[in-house]
Amino acid sequence: EITRLYLGVAENPLVDVIGHCATVGYEFDYEKCMKKFKECGKLVEINESSITWKNTSGNYREIIRLCKKHEVPVIVNSDAHFCTLVGRFDNALKLLDEQDFPERLVVNADIDRLTELITAKKSNILR
């Protein structure tokens, strides 16, 4: 059921980022969905808050492994729920480093790469 929902979301042209996809208890066929996310040009969010507070490291390890395998770009996000945590992604970066995840696939690791993506996806946003 959850796999089917993610496959449907992947086909939605209004969705650019697949967020909170490592939630414990809501696992899905990661392999099948990462392939579909790649095919549909989606980014996968690596969510610091979920890693830190919701014990999603195991699921994220598998998701990151598959994103690397299928060259699915990711976007790292603090998802801060308190002002002092804005911009903190220590655990997310650690998981990416553990997998030797290519920096070129981390969209927001480079401002030019991020701007290019935003411009391509939503050309009228930056005007």
Predicted segments, located by residue:
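Active-site glycine-rich loop that binds ribose-phosphate moieties when present
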Residues: 1-5
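Charged catalytic cores and adjacent phosphate/nucleic-acid-binding surfaces used
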Residues: 7, 12-15, 25-127
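Histidine-centered catalytic micro-motifs
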Residues: 18-22
